[in-house]
Amino acid sequence: MATGNVGKLVQIIGAVVDIRFSSEEIPALLSAITIQGPDGLVTVEVAQHIGDDTARCVAMRSTDGLVRGMEAIDTGAPITVPVGRETLGRIFNVLGEVVDEGKPVEAKMHLPIHREAPSFEEQEAATEIFETGIKVVDLIAPYARGGKVGLFGGAGVGKTVLIMELINNIAKEHGGLSVFAGVGERTREGNDLYHEMIESGVIDKTSLVYGQMNEPPGARMRVGLTGLTMAEYFRDQEGQDVLLFIDNIFRFTQAGSEVSALLGRMPSAVGYQPTLATEMGALQERITSTKKGSITSVQAVYVPADDLTDPAPATTFAHLDATTVLSRQISELGIYPAVDPLDSNSRILDPATVGQEHYEVARGVQEVLQRYKELQDIIAILGMDELSDEDKLTVARARRVQRFLSQPFFVAEQFTGMAGKYVPLKETIRGFKEILDGKHDDLPESAFLFVGSIDEAVEKANKG
């Protein structure tokens, strides 16, 4: 595949290398170039042309051991990765190489990681609800089939656990294919996820692509595109409804900001790259539904210092159909998943899409929780006795609703000792409607904590 163009390394600064070619043979932007390093082949991607004859490139592997004067060979094409059924059950790196110590993948087809987003004619608007079996998500911030969902949260509030539960539920209940792109997260989590998928039997329906924290920024910047390319194949060639999980989209931005200064760009707000919105758009616009199939994407978004106005999460917000916000205050109450029902929202929580009953119950839940939040200052200063009877009832119901929003997860069984629960949407709506209507005012609050359906809460209270 190589064009035979040979260049020479003239400068190496961390993850960025400059390669000099003869002026008429300089490789195109985004071309892959290979360099034979002491520890194997190093692939770099052309990011800029400097002068007439120099290509400034970003490395996909560590540049340790590279020296000036080494030969670099132009492949004449962007990075291409294997796609198709052969990729299921395997772990890949950014270059599409197998990293699970298994035998190499013999895919019938390879595709470049840089592609145009589908045109307007090819796209299809998503209005259908995608059931996850997680009560708080399905009720308050329902996901659209073929939509984009963001999981926002600081460090350690449960973003990755929620993603793992979604993978588990969707593989078991919907039998759909998933692609998981691990972008700049912990190697241990990637390893745990792989082994849990083997144990739960969902590995055969999933392709995994990892570029962990210890990888150079070039790999972390491009690994999301590698996963997306694999998902696009299932959507376009096989007409599948694919799930694309990205954990963590913030690390994609972070990697871009690491190489941006080395590429000589002036930093923008808070030190981020000036091309932040463009880079994010190039990735997000390819995640969409077409007339052939859909890609439903769930993206964990790390929020630096819990500040939602930071440019990285703020830029991500613009692309999302639903946001699931994880709150430290709720996790401190011991309620998991720690989803904030007042901060989370969805574009499809609309009577025309979800139906009148679902809409009214969801808004009723938010109303009662909002009133409880307003009353908390009064309760803290004066105590419950100073509230009117109506407010006392609101608080009692709000506390039951708050606890009923918790749920035991399948993927956390080994830590919690509680069996996981999948709750159908109809059961979720019925349960919250009955609590709001006061049918369960006689049950103790503890009965609602970590149960599936409302019938289980009643059963738990009766066992006492």
UniProtKB/Swiss-Prot annotation:
Belongs to the ATPase alpha/beta chains family. GO terms for molecular function: ATP binding; ATP hydrolysis activity; proton-transporting ATP synthase activity, rotational mechanism. PANTHER family: ATP SYNTHASE, ATP SYNTHASE SUBUNIT BETA, MITOCHONDRIAL. Keywords: ATP synthesis, ATP-binding, Cell membrane, CF(1), Hydrogen ion transport, Ion transport, Membrane, Nucleotide-binding, Translocase, Transport. This is ATP synthase subunit beta. HAMAP family: ATP_synth_beta_bact. It is an enzyme of class 7 (translocase). It comes from Alkaliphilus metalliredigens (strain QYMF). It comes from the Bacteria. The keyword Ion transport applies. F-type ATPases have 2 components, CF(1) - the catalytic core - and CF(0) - the membrane proton channel. CF(1) has five subunits: alpha(3), beta(3), gamma(1), delta(1), epsilon(1). CF(0) has three main subunits: a(1), b(2) and c(9-12). The alpha and beta chains form an alternating ring which encloses part of the gamma chain. CF(1) is attached to CF(0) by a central stalk formed by the gamma and epsilon chains, while a peripheral stalk is formed by the delta and b chains. It catalyses: ATP + H2O + 4 H(+)(in) = ADP + phosphate + 5 H(+)(out). Pfam families: ATP-synt_ab (PF00006), ATP-synt_ab_N (PF02874), ATP-synt_VA_C (PF22919). The gene is atpD. Its EC number is 7.1.2.2. It is found in: Cell membrane. It is a peripheral membrane protein. GO terms for cellular component: plasma membrane; proton-transporting ATP synthase complex. Produces ATP from ADP in the presence of a proton gradient across the membrane. The catalytic sites are hosted primarily by the beta subunits. The keyword Acetylation does not apply. ATP binds at residues 153-160.
